[in-house]
Amino acid sequence: MGKLTGKTALITGALQGIGEGIARTFARHGANLILLDISPEIEKLADELCGRGHRCTAVVADVRDPASVAAAIKRAKEKEGRIDILVNNAGVCRLGSFLDMSDDDRDFHIDINIKGVWNVTKAVLPEMIARKDGRIVMMSSVTGDMVADPGETAYALTKAAIVGLTKSLAVEYAQSGIRVNAICPGYVRTPMAESIARQSNPEDPESVLTEMAKAIPLRRLADPLEVGELAAFLASDESSYLTGTQNVIDGGSTLPETVSVGI
């Protein structure tokens, strides 16, 4: 029996990257899955996992739209009954300097990375409170709260906000049996990382990923499945005394000094 057997998990942004990695990992640990994404392609991932013997429901929704979220969750609960675990993973990143970034691009980050998390959490939380049991995993980043890079001001702003939201919700709903924890990944080999690499160097994006890896003490980018294992831990009873925490998974990328004077 897996650590998540008998639990139903809603994962947003589940189609690809970290979200897909979490979905596959949760399935392996026995969870029933509700996979939410803005793309109808999410049905294919759900069909694949169902074909492998996992219980899985796909719902299409735009996390920016509370009505869309509410309708999707209603459909999912009609099939799955309840939601024990929420993984707020849906997120975006577009590079652009602070002065050059348009208001539309700024709001794009805020609407998905902050308001989207707010909307989904607000839709799921009341049921968890009524049962006095729930686990919420927030996808933040090392970018924003711990480190920063040029061109990622909007992204850093929103991911730092998720840390604050995590801690606030953890305090506010601890006595309701709700645990809320954040994951702060470093570089993960995902379509988002590949998109950042293309924006940085359209002619040779792979070289950007190679340089990223060289700057990491473990000398590689994370696999989404590794982030999935951390999420599974936070969603399981193994982390029963953890709430309001920031869990860094970055291969040591935030450890080195900018300029080393060591050996």
UniProtKB/Swiss-Prot annotation:
Transmembrane segments: none annotated. Keywords: Oxidoreductase. SUPFAM superfamilies: NAD(P)-binding Rossmann-fold domains. Disulfide bonds: none annotated. NAD(+) binds at residues 10-32. Its EC number is 1.-.-.-. It is an enzyme of class 1 (oxidoreductase). It comes from the Bacteria. InterPro entries: NAD(P)-bd_dom_sf (IPR036291), SDR_fam (IPR002347). Gene3D superfamilies: NAD(P)-binding Rossmann-like Domain. CDD domains: DHRS6_like_SDR_c. GO terms for molecular function: oxidoreductase activity, acting on the CH-OH group of donors, NAD or NADP as acceptor. Substrate binds at residue 141. The keyword Oxidoreductase applies. The active site is at 155 (proton acceptor). Belongs to the short-chain dehydrogenases/reductases (SDR) family. This is Oxidoreductase UcpA. It comes from Escherichia coli O157:H7. The lineage of its organism: Bacteria, Pseudomonadati, Pseudomonadota, Gammaproteobacteria, Enterobacterales.
